């Protein structure tokens, strides 16, 4: 890091303590009798105090099992929470399309819409509303990309309450309780202490 500070070192120590205390934690894949694709996307708007860039994250589940996830600090500054969430939605739709193509090649894809969960109603409204507003002109390409997938029935957007948002742990720091709840939702277990 080019401008490391003591808070960065504290964050590294926190991560190392977590990893040391959870050596057997990993993903458990279960057969759930279906291969439905669901995904969650989230963004933490203007979270970086240095440059006000946002962090976006997503999780993709196939058959209830976590198969893909990403957390990334974005290279641009968003003007609103809705814009940050909408750009995160665009990233997860791209990933869901890749998963869809993989399942198609494996001949296991069911012809049902893949659900994308987002906790920002404004971002969902932008996707469904074909009218371009001055405040969303700069996300026009993402709008047409998502709108095309909605209209063709490939994806379906749904609202999830913040408490049910699985991608929260990829965009912001969580307390111990919230982290454990989110890890359980992702299918993570501790092989040394199974529940």
Task: Place the predicted regions along the sequence by residue.
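RNase H-like nuclease module associated with reverse transcription
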Residues: 35-36, 54, 66, 72-195
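Short helix-to-loop capping/linker segments positioned immediately adjacent to catalytic or ligand/cofactor-binding
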Residues: 3, 25-27, 47-49, 105
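Hydrophobic side chains in beta-strands
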Residues: 29, 39-41, 62, 90, ...
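C-terminal reverse transcriptase regions that engage the nucleic-acid substrate
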Residues: 1-26, 161
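Structured nucleic-acid-interacting core domains from mobile-element enzymes and related host factors
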Residues: 17-43, 108-110
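Extended, low-complexity cationic-aromatic segments
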Residues: 40-42, 51, 168
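Acidic, metal-ligating active-site segments
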Residues: 44-64
């Amino acid at each position: 890091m080019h401008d490391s500070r003591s808070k960065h070192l504290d964050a590294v120590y926190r991560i190392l303590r977590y990893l040391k205390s959870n050596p057997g934690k990993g993903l458990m894949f279960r057969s759930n009798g279906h291969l439905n694709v669901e995904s969650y996307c989230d963004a933490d708007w203007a979270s970086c105090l240095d440059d006000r860039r946002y962090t976006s994250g997503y999780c993709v589940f196939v058959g209830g099992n976590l198969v893909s996830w990403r957390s990334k600090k974005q290279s641009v500054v968003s003007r609103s929470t809705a814009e940050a969430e909408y750009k995160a939605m665009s990233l997860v739709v791209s990933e869901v399309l890749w998963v869809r193509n993989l399942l198609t090649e494996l001949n296991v894809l069911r012809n049902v819409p893949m659900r994308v969960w987002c906790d920002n109603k404004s971002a969902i409204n932008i996707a469904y509303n074909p009218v371009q507003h001055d405040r969303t002109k700069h996300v026009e390409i993402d709008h047409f990309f998502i709108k095309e997938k909605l209209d063709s029935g490939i994806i379906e957007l749904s609202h999830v309450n913040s408490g049910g948002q699985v991608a929260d742990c990829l965009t912001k720091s969580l307390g111990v309780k919230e982290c454990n709840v989110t890890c359980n939702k992702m299918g993570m277990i501790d092989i040394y202490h199974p529940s």
